[in-house]
Amino acid sequence: MMMKHFVYGNEISTNTLKETKSIIFGGGCFWGLEKKFWELSGVVLTSVGYSGGKTENPSYEEVCSGFTDHVEVVKVDYKPNDIELKDLLRVFWEAHDPTQGMRQGNDIGSQYRSVVFIEDEADRDVVELSLNLFQEELYNNNFGTITTEISITEKYFLAEEYHQQYLAKNPNGYCGLGGTGCKLKI
């Protein structure tokens, strides 16, 4: 079944588009995190889904049960000639509190943990540098230790259509996502 992106107008796919790279972020409710990437020049597609767990093709209800180990995630396809990975990472780190472990604000559970799934090892250095720089900023502002997991992209399962671009379709919809107020200097 083809899904059309509500913001960009193109087809949503789990495959990375030609001449783009992808990265997957988990940082709380995927509705709010996805919205953060829509207006960035160089981002060509976003979608929400589930990754990092053990169940094939999980449903939202299964993920929320906590038994699948999946995380609510946002897949960002971008043109590396138009936007750098560090700029996407800045949005990610500043959008949520990566020190909260298995929660983001009022959203509690393993599906809300902070993760970065990279396409290949070439991206790991940039991601780890950004983590270390943001950790320093957090410590300087009396926050705790970052709990974000970094690993190679595992299987990505597209979430149900009603979750895709949810806050564009429902501008007054719930979003408990909130950052720390700290800025990434990279």
Identify the function of each model-found stretch.
Residues 1-186:
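Flexible coil/turn and secondary-structure edge motifs
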